[in-house]
Amino acid sequence: MGQKVHPNGIRLGIVKPWNATWFASSQEFADNLDGDFKVRQYLTKELKKASLSRIVIERPAKSIRVTIHTARPGVVIGKKGEDVEKLRAGVAKIAGVPAQINIAEVRKPELDGQLVADSIASQLERRVMFRRAMKRAVQNAMRLGAKGIKVEVSGRLGGAEIARSEWYREGRVPLHTLRADIDYATSSAHTQYGVIGVKVWIFKGEVLGGMPAANAVEPKADKPKKQRRSRK
């Protein structure tokens, strides 16, 4: 039976960047990894209402640099930068090194997989009909230029006794094409009937020229063999 690989993991280094870019010795690696996990946990908890897309962590020379991708940068920064300064102090305390926080704005939240999944989950928690929430997300993404989108929800939909999965797709979502830029994200809605899982795949187009042309080695053509002339 065929199984689905994680769409982001299989594309790392091809069309997808890493969410953490640092190198460490074997002695420091576990501490850094644990620090990353705690920093992400802290920021996700503090920025619940800030439409958080992703968190990128870098560790240049005895410090930590965190880039927060959000659709609402004003909520993260706060009045006169008070909130971002509080976040910086919190991250520095967790990591144990000086911290720097950068804010990157997500221009089109309707085309960001994580934001779409979180939006559907919050609507389900507000008792919006799941089909309406799914259809609205699909229509908004296609209207803003997505090549394709698939949304799946699973659980006790509509308070049903038996859990089931339902999905809605429009356009193309080529999971086997490695050069396809597919934004995959998951979220969960905590309703009175239980937890409903949300999965979103957004196909934004193919990334051509991923490998530089200079690195591509062309096979050498065989030289035509010269015919020997017979001596008279």
UniProtKB/Swiss-Prot annotation:
CDD domains (UniProt xref): KH-II_30S_S3
Gene Ontology terms: biological process: translation
GO cellular component terms attached to this protein's record: cytosolic small ribosomal subunit
Keyword vocabulary terms for this entry: Ribonucleoprotein, Ribosomal protein, RNA-binding, rRNA-binding
Domain (KH type-2): residue spans on this chain: 39-107
Gene Ontology terms, MF aspect: mRNA binding; rRNA binding; structural constituent of ribosome
Cross-referenced SUPFAM superfamilies: Prokaryotic type KH domain (KH-domain type II), Ribosomal protein S3 C-terminal domain
InterPro entries, per database record: KH_dom (IPR004087), KH_dom-like_a/b (IPR015946), KH_dom_type_2 (IPR004044), KH_sf_prok-type (IPR009019), Ribosomal_S3_C_sf (IPR036419), Ribosomal_uS3_bac-typ (IPR005704), Ribosomal_uS3_C (IPR001351), Ribosomal_uS3_CS (IPR018280)
Entry superkingdom: Bacteria
Family label: Belongs to the universal ribosomal protein uS3 family.
NCBIfam families attached to this UniProt entry: rpsC_bact
SUBUNIT field: Part of the 30S ribosomal subunit. Forms a tight complex with proteins S10 and S14.
Function: Binds the lower part of the 30S subunit head. Binds mRNA in the 70S ribosome, positioning it for translation.
Protein name: Small ribosomal subunit protein uS3
Species in which this protein is naturally found: Aliivibrio fischeri (strain ATCC 700601 / ES114)
